[in-house]
């Protein structure tokens, strides 16, 4: 099985909260696609709550589009990581890590402005596979933690696992 890019970086050295360019690709027509690792918490040290990350999934996707989409950037998808330490964001374009970090922080401010659980988008059995598994309070706790900590940048060169280590795993 091929080694996926996300498993060639040392998760024990990742900072969080932090933005990392996980991958650059181009479509056959030459459009740039960038995949970002939006690491909310340090791998193997902390984990986002099940209800909190699910609520963030519903809120974050729209808020990030509000703050980052423009003439040269269009978000394709924002999805939670299976390990529950963050989200992957795929987009058309090549915004800087700082632009992404600023949009992320602005989105967390937006999460804090949501007053009631009923304001969570697509919170119904027709549009959500587990619509009762949400917590606005937990999502807002996560948002407060991100704002308080600030968002840094993780660089692949700083996190790259050596061929020797990869060979031992």
Curated annotation (Swiss-Prot):
PANTHER family to which the protein is assigned, alphabetical: S-RIBOSYLHOMOCYSTEINE LYASE
Source organism of the structure: Shewanella sp. (strain MR-7)
Entry cofactors: Fe cation
GO BP annotations, alphabetical order: quorum sensing
Protein name as annotated: S-ribosylhomocysteine lyase
Reactions this protein catalyses: S-(5-deoxy-D-ribos-5-yl)-L-homocysteine = (S)-4,5-dihydroxypentane-2,3-dione + L-homocysteine
GO MF, one example: iron ion binding
Top-level taxonomy: Bacteria, Pseudomonadati, Pseudomonadota, Gammaproteobacteria, Alteromonadales
Keywords attached to this entry: Autoinducer synthesis, Iron, Lyase, Metal-binding, Quorum sensing
């Amino acid at each position: 099985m091929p080694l996926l890019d996300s498993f060639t970086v040392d998760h024990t050295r990742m900072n969080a909260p932090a933005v990392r360019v996980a991958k650059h690709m181009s479509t056959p027509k030459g459009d740039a696609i960038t995949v970002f690792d939006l690491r909310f918490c340090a791998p193997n040290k902390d984990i986002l709550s099940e209800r909190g990350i699910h609520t963030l999934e519903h809120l974050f996707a729209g808020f990030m589009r509000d703050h980052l989409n423009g003439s040269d950037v269009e978000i394709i998808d924002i999805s939670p990581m299976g390990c529950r330490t963050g989200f992957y964001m795929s987009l058309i374009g090549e915004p800087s890590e700082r632009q992404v970090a600023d949009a992320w922080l602005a989105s967390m401010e937006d999460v804090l402005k949501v007053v009631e659980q009923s304001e969570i988008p697509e919170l119904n059995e027709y549009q959500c596979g587990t619509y009762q598994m949400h917590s606005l309070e937990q999502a807002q706790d996560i948002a407060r933690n991100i704002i308080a900590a600030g968002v840094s940048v993780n660089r692949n060169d700083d996190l790259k696992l050596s061929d020797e280590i990869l060979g031992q795993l």
